[in-house]
Amino acid sequence: MINIASFKVLKGYEHWKTVFMDEAFVKRREEAGVKVLAKGFDAQNERVYVIQELDSMEVIQNAMAKNQEKIMEAGVDMSTMQMIPLQD
């Protein structure tokens, strides 16, 4: 399935991207079964968008629960997090 995650960042997009693309964090996502198809920043509404392919929403929920420290380091404002699961 495809999931679109959208959120605001507290430390800026470039900082978020640096943490998100860190080799160890990329490996954690791969091991969890999360494949990132695209990512980007919409300056007009100040939101980051990440398009992911995964088996189920449970996969991303478990991955996020296990990586809360890294998510906080990246500056993700969890109060703005939106997940949109797309089913074919």
Residue positions per predicted region:
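Short S/T/G/P-rich N-terminal loop/turn motif that feeds into the first structured element of a domain
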Residues: 1-88
